[in-house]
UniProtKB/Swiss-Prot annotation:
This is Caveolin-1. Its main location: Golgi. One of its GO terms (biological process) is T cell costimulation. InterPro entries: Caveolin, Caveolin_CS. It comes from Takifugu rubripes (Japanese pufferfish).
Length: 181
């Protein structure tokens, strides 16, 4: 089978088979353009080797709802009760530096073990979801399908005529309310 080769054409001249070239991509029938660079980039990209952004460490804005506490949010002096300017500057510096270094120290000591624990937790969660939850749900849906058909037949056989008859009997009932003074 030539797969759509014209006279004089060789199969080596094409990036993809002539059948796909003439007929289009099998997944998108009328798409004759197959960009192999994009396909290779998508298939070669590995999530374990991607670079992380050290500047924007919350690209999905996961912590936007978390309270961001600055010095001005915690300590404020109302008008007329100001401390010395030097004390105010020293307090600001002490608060900011202490918060900064305590956070860094805590993340250095506890961050890596917690990252390990959360990595294990989400790996287990993914494993359970992929290998237990989804197959159980799919099995349940397959098994319940035959029961739902029997249930549907019973409802249409027994309940539908009963409720249609009740609807016809009670459909003519009219209620009139009047207010007596």
């Amino acid at each position: 089978m030539t797969g759509g080769l014209r006279d004089g054409e060789k199969e080596e001249e094409f990036l993809h088979s002539p059948f796909i070239r003439k007929q289009g991509n099998i997944y998108k029938p009328y798409n004759k353009d197959m960009d192999y660079d994009i396909l290779n980039e998508k298939s070669m990209e590995d999530v374990h080797t991607k670079e992380i952004d050290l500047v924007n460490r919350d690209p999905t804005h996961l912590n936007d709802d978390v309270v961001k506490v600055d010095f001005e949010d915690v300590i404020a002096e109302p008008a007329g009760t100001y401390s010395f300017d030097g004390v105010w500057k020293a307090s600001f510096t002490t608060f900011t530096v202490t918060k900064y270094w305590c956070y860094r120290l805590l993340t250095a000591l506890v961050g890596i073990p917690l990252a390990l624990i959360w990595g294990i937790f989400f790996a287990i969660l993914s494993f359970i979801h992929i290998w237990a939850v989804v197959p159980c749900v799919k099995s349940y849906l397959i098994e319940i399908h035959c029961i739902s058909r029997v249930y549907s037949i019973c409802v249409h056989t027994f309940c539908d005529p009963l409720f249609e008859a009740m609807g016809k009997c009670l459909g003519g009932v009219r209620i009139r309310t009047s207010k007596e003074v």
